[in-house]
Regions:
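Alpha-helical DNA-contacting segments of helix-turn-helix folds
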Residues: 12, 47-54, 117-120
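Hydrophobic alpha-helical segments that form the core
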Residues: 122-129, 141-162, 172-184
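Hydrophobic alpha-helical bundle segments that form small-molecule/ligand-binding pockets
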Residues: 70-76, 95-114, 122-148, 188-192
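Residues in soluble alpha-helical coiled-coils and helical-bundle/repeat scaffolds
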Residues: 41-45, 49, 74, 95, ...
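Short hydrophobic clusters on alpha-helical segments that form packing/core surfaces
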Residues: 4-12, 54, 58, 90, ...
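Helix-turn-helix
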Residues: 3, 7, 11-45, 49
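Hydrophobic alpha-helical connector segments
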Residues: 49, 64-95, 151
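Amphipathic alpha-helical interaction segments
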Residues: 3, 45, 81-85, 89, ...
Length: 195
């Protein structure tokens, strides 16, 4: 299974998810086509597994970064510290892992896989809610969930957009994302509710 996924990932990076061919995966992995179909009944199933693995890596990075953030700031990071830490980690993952961007692009082209991305944004938001409630001193879980979902989806979209454009604009997009997110969190904190 791992050999099949490794080859599939190489092909997605080289040619894009749309061009992924099961026969080529089998050929490069050195297995019979029936072996590929035994584990993955379709190209979408391969992309789904690659996307799921990437999303799990991102979630582990996020857990580590949020834990470190709270530890380094005695449990009381500012909105700016939180945004800078999380955006930098998220962006670095996609910048340093071009395969992750290729898999994400492939997942976006399939409606069923887009649902996986939305589910992951919800999972990320659920993870962020307690931290945001602590950072912002807010108590309305549903309100903070909506804010966290917006932050998760916006961060992902802008990070991937930044990687698709040239370097000067790339840095500007990430910087402006941070300004926007910090302003949103600080406004929520000042209002006593998610803005």
């Amino acid at each position: 299974v791992e050999a099949i996924l490794d080859v599939a990932l190489e092909l997605v990076v080289e040619q894009g998810a749309e061009a992924l061919a099961m026969r080529e995966v089998a050929r490069r992995a050195g297995v019979q086509i029936s072996s590929v179909y035994q584990y993955f009944p379709s190209k979408a199933a391969i992309i789904r597994e690659l996307a799921t693995r990437n999303l799990e890596r991102v979630h582990l990075i996020l857990e580590r970064e949020v834990g470190d953030l709270f530890a380094e700031h005695d449990g009381r990071p500012t909105p700016a510290q939180a945004v800078n830490r999380v955006v930098d980690a998220y962006y670095a993952h996609y910048r340093d892992q071009p395969a992750a961007v290729a898999v994400w692009a492939g997942a976006q082209s399939d409606h069923g896989l887009r649902e996986l991305d939305i589910e992951d944004s919800r999972r990320t938001a659920e993870f962020l809610v307690p931290s945001l409630m602590e950072i912002l001193s807010l108590t309305d879980t549903q309100d903070v969930f909506a804010l966290a979902l917006l932050l998760a989806e916006t961060t992902g979209a802008v990070a991937r957009l930044a990687l698709a454009v040239e370097a000067p604009l790339r840095d500007q997009l990430v910087a402006k994302l941070k300004v926007m997110l910090i302003a949103t969190l600080e406004a929520s904190q000042a209002n006593g509710r998610a803005a």
